[in-house]
Amino acid sequence: MTTDQHQEILRTEGLSKFFPGVKALDNVDFSLRRGEIMALLGENGAGKSTLIKALTGVYHADRGTIWLEGQAISPKNTAHAQQLGIGTVYQEVNLLPNMSVADNLFIGREPKRFGLLRRKEMEKRATELMASYGFSLDVREPLNRFSVAMQQIVAICRAIDLSAKVLILDEPTASLDTQEVELLFDLMRQLRDRGVSLIFVTHFLDQVYQVSDRITVLRNGSFVGCRETCELPQIELVKMMLGRELDTHALQRAGRTLLSDKPVAAFKNYGKKGTIAPFDLEVRPGEIVGLAGLLGSGRTETAEVIFGIKPADSGTALIKGKPQNLRSPHQASVLGIGFCPEDRKTDGIIAAASVRENIILALQARRGWLRPISRKEQQEIAERFIRQLGIRTPSTEQPIEFLSGGNQQKVLLSRWLLTRPQFLILDEPTRGIDVGAHAEIIRLIETLCADGLALLVISSELEELVGYADRVIIMRDRKQVAEIPLAELSVPAIMNAIAA
């Protein structure tokens, strides 16, 4: 924290935002000091995103006041918030990937003379701006030639150069590896030391303790508390977030007896040139096979080839003992395969559609649109899964975009469970959801396994994989490089295999 550590720069008083049947923010008081990194934490549905959107003009609060440097403000939109001095950088960088770094840094405010772009001057200023934070790169190169971490750094530098006094970083490390995270943290510390105030939204608690000065916790739309990071034990932080003790029972797995030795799905030398090297994989009823590896190792590509999103061009696939050609997701679904993708918002949910409509989607697609599911049956199905999976929603007709990440994930699980699959692929099932929902999702995974479902689970949460997987396959450079049996399964064993 800077020498102005006690000088408040941003404050909300009684901030409230309501949606039909939901108090997204309820009388929230929030305070941010000049030159500090504030972690903003809470379960999904706690109100973090709503608070950010209220601060940046995406939403207009129904009640309460926002104060910036002692002045009451009411941002009309994100551009107005930026003019006032509040900038935001999201996990998915909101820049123009095909344009140069310099173009992205100065888009909308390019140096011109007589109406003509002064490109050399812009590139010089862009180089100087990046160098001022210790980054040396060719600003003439397209942004998409750089890593996700560097793209985020460019977005941050742009926001700061636009005179941001407060910078909100929303899940900036979700797609970064360890080295990239440290690169980002170095920049965050530089900004803090220069007097910029940062709000850091994340689900990674270890990172909170690495980089933040204070922690604010929200729960169910309400302010729970704000504490100095160095004075808050992690177990107490979890209690603040959950309002209860963390249920660790779901993270502990007893031994499991497989229901059958015959694989539900078996793949031999199965692969797709340019996507994933040929691999062997068998999954049996009641078995959980984990898939581990670094980002870009080929985990998601493996799932996409199996599910027919990127059809294989080599090898054989046996589903319930019969050779099959998995050429499309529809064909895979008909054969009893389900797939919950990593990116819920892009590849999973239909944001504006209701919970009911999202749940019945896969079953309706399998039946065909000439055999519609009646509205009464849809309602009964949705109510049954809301009850069975504990989906928190005011009604079956609530647009799914207003549900928390954990509840969206449960809706996606419901969608595929409704089709009664025999083989289900889960890609990062607990990513982007809170610590409490983690345990709930893992409990669901265990229940599905006990019911005889064959599961392939892709996860970066190694402790979780060790907790529930029967064996773990290791991916590296889009190849299957190792398999760790249950007797040898541990976090160090997985990490050593990944790094070998």
Swiss-Prot record:
Source taxon at top rank: Bacteria
Keyword Cell inner membrane: yes
Residues passing through the membrane, by range: none
Chief localization: membrane
Subcellular localization, as worded in the UniProt entry: Cell inner membrane
Assembly and interaction partners: The complex is composed of two ATP-binding proteins (YtfR), two transmembrane proteins (YtfT and YjfF) and a solute-binding protein (YtfQ).
Name this protein carries in UniProt: Galactofuranose transporter ATP-binding protein YtfR
